[in-house]
């Protein structure tokens, strides 16, 4: 069986936004966030693919989740760093954060928003799991708990142990990167949730509709890379 690539954003969304895979999504979020108490429930706020996603190569195929305590978590898979990536991530966080406040509400009603980016590339950062907050320059006091952006660079997964990351996050990174399909069998033997993730990916890979969606997205990504290469060659990027 040819498995769909979980690094492809449409496959990532189909896998983790599916109602019958809430346990996988909860496990993934727990591995990244390491909350002080268990995540009791997750509600996917955007389970459907955006309109015109196939024709618009710039559309984001993220998974927006609301936790039991009202915290919103946005999870995104990126196969390569975009230009102005930091500004892009911050802008997207700001839009989500502002969207939690209704007209006339007090600022105290703003809900925390966490953005999680799984990136299949290395940036200038040196860590496998980078966590960005807003802190005072001298005493490093935290300005607000509300701003939190996690970036997990999948190629740096071998650094996970040295960074004292959880075994669960290391396993999820290996699952998402999936350089060798045989790695799934190894992961499945290490953890029951990984065995369930393996089964879910195999089932998704058998669906003709998922195969078609993945092919459309691959073609769009290929066309986008060609456009960027042409821009660079002509000095526009």
Show which residues each predicted segment covers:
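Elongated, amphipathic alpha-helical interaction scaffolds
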Residues: 1-237
């Amino acid at each position: 069986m040819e498995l769909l690539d979980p690094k492809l954003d449409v496959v990532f969304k189909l896998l983790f936004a599916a109602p019958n895979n809430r346990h996988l999504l909860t496990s993934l979020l727990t591995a990244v966030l390491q909350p002080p108490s268990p995540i009791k429930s997750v509600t996917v706020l955007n389970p459907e693919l955006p309109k015109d996603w196939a024709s618009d190569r710039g559309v984001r195929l993220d998974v927006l989740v609301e936790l039991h305590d009202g915290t919103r978590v946005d999870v995104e898979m990126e196969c390569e760093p975009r230009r102005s990536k930091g500004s892009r991530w911050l802008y997207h966080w700001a839009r989500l954060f502002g969207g939690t406040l209704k007209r006339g509400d007090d600022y105290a009603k703003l809900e925390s928003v966490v953005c999680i980016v799984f990136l299949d590339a290395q940036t200038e950062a040196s860590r496998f799991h980078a966590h960005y907050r807003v802190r005072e320059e001298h005493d490093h006091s935290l300005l607000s708990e509300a701003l939190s952006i996690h970036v997990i660079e999948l190629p740096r997964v071998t650094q996970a142990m040295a960074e004292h990351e959880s075994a669960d996050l290391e396993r999820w990174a290996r699952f998402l990167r999936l350089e060798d399909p045989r790695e799934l069998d190894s992961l499945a033997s290490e953890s029951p949730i990984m065995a369930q993730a393996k089964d879910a990916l195999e089932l998704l890979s058998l669906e003709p509709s998922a195969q078609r969606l993945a092919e459309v997205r691959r073609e769009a990504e290929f066309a986008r890379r060609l456009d960027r290469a042409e821009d660079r060659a002509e000095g526009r990027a």
